[in-house]
Amino acid sequence: MKKIDNKTFKTINKLLMDRSTHNTTNNNTQNIININFPNILSIGKENVVKTLTRGEKKFILDSRWTSIDKMVEIVHCKNHNTFKNILITNLKDKFAYKYDETKGYFITGNKTDLLDDILTFRMIDLETIYDELSTANKIDSKTKKLIQEFLDKMDNEEPFSYGDVEYPNYKSYKMNNIKILLYNNQDKITQDIALLIGDGKISNEIPKNEIIS
């Protein structure tokens, strides 16, 4: 598979913006036309706990110290296209893209703020899943111990170092890992968004040389 570049994402997002503008114009003139927007939810509106399978939940918790990384990967990068709501196309600048379901397209946001939102919401989901599986006796004692240690570490504000890199705290270290994870998965996320657009009956408007299989 050839790499999907940022130009392709901008092409896709422009189609979403055009659709949104067209929908608003028709509503304002009382000409109601059904516009099929991608079924993507804004950050924080995902019902992750009810969406993930028991197997996915178990797999996430079995990742132990990398459970939050695995959570973000499964939720935002894998098969749950409804949650393809954040895209990082550059590691160096301060910006990232987030989907705004009220607008119907992706908007630019502060990368650090978006990553903090993702981490906050997914940590809430992680703790909920941990409680759910723990109550159901689906977690072994070793995993329970390591997950508890991980959760405590995430709340620890002491500086954390990994290799030669110093971080303000462990949460900042994990946030950096998630940033790289999302960046490395930008091609799949972009392609899956393109497929959602196709499901919305507007795939023919995307130049054929922009979606590469």
What is each stretch, according to the model?
Residues 1-3, 8-213:
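Extended amphipathic coiled-coil helices
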